[in-house]
Amino acid sequence: DMEDALNSYINSINKIDYLFMVAAVSDYVIKEPSINKIKRNKESLDIEFTHAPDLIKAISSRTDATIIGFALETENGEYNAKQKMKDKDLDYIVLNYANEDNAGFETNTNHVIIFSKDGAKKELTLDRKDRISAKLINYIINNK
């Protein structure tokens, strides 16, 4: 459950120096979950969703740790990533594009751009994901 996850994170954040939040647990949750099985007796089913708690936003205001978020975008990437960094009070945001060849999902390679709240920008060109991860961690630790 989302509230349990939030409480668990909050209870442990004061013990860390860096927090890499690589993906949202869920952006939306079912507004009124059914406690019973939903039978197939209609042609269609409408389910209403509501915003899930924003874990990274809740955490960023309660820790001195360096918080790194990620933004997967398809358009207006730089603007959206910087806005997300500001809105969620992050120290860094890592932008990658879902619609870029050989990057994003279902590939062993990626290309990312790192933005910091102090205005720095660092591009990590297309490389294997394990190398991108190592370069990302090294950059963050050496630029704190």
Please identify what each model-predicted range represents.
Residues 1-72, 76-144:
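A cross-family phosphate/adenosyl-ligand binding-site feature
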